[in-house]
Amino acid sequence: MKIGIIVAMKKELALLTPLLDNHELKTIDGQTFSLGMMGKHDVVAMQCGIGKVNAAIGALTLINHFRPELIINTGVAGGANANVNVMDLVVGVQVTYHDVWCGPESTWGAVQGLPLYYEGDQRLIKMLPQRPDIKQGLITSGDQFIDRIEKINEIQSKFPQVLAVDMESGAIAQTCELRHTPFLSMRVISDSPGASHNNTQQYNNFWEEAPEHTFALLHQLITSL
């Protein structure tokens, strides 16, 4: 199987590429792709950049040039639920936007003509180990770093079931929906807005201590396919 993996940031990619065997680089349209193997599967990994536009462009370039059978978006996210802690892994059974509204008679979070919720790939979800640090549920995306409890409260008012917030999953999920490519978002919680007086510092501390096993579950799932 050919699998695409998308991260947003250079420091996320630096934790991911050591997991690739026979690693080589390929540049297309100014974007660099890391090609290699995980177990018996061909993997194409890339850093798309932060935000929804970068994420969509990266996902579409990956799909058009490499035709993956599955795309996984991974990296860090902010916790958005009292039951989610820093270093937990949140798997997006569903993904939506928290900052999209197309006007009266539309549903908050839905792009007109498209689903409100994008569904995660059930094959991988069913393979997840039962561990207290692995949470399954809703991830919401928007073009802002969530740093205040007021913002979390606003998101929760529209999506009470939300577990995590990020800036890319929704755009990648939408691109995969339009290009008929299975998708899953798997995020490591780096900070918890509202749980700390300074979640920006909490986020920075996470990266100072970011363990090599941050992407261990991703590697485990892919090699088990």
Where are these regions (language model features)?
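Short glycine-/acidic-enriched loop or helix-start segments at secondary-structure transitions
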Residues: L15-T17, A56, N81-V84, V100-W101, ...
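Mid-sequence, gly/pro-rich, charge-dense loop/helix-turn segments that line enzyme active sites
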Residues: A80-F159
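N-terminal short beta-loop-beta anion/metal-coordinating cradle
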Residues: M1-H65
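Regulatory input/activation interfaces that engage signals or partners
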Residues: F183, V188-L225
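A C-terminal functional module that forms or caps the active site or interfaces directly
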Residues: I146-Q201
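Glycine-rich beta-alpha junction loops
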Residues: M9, G78, V95, S141-Q144, ...
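Proline-aspartate-enriched helix->loop->beta-strand connector
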Residues: R67-I72
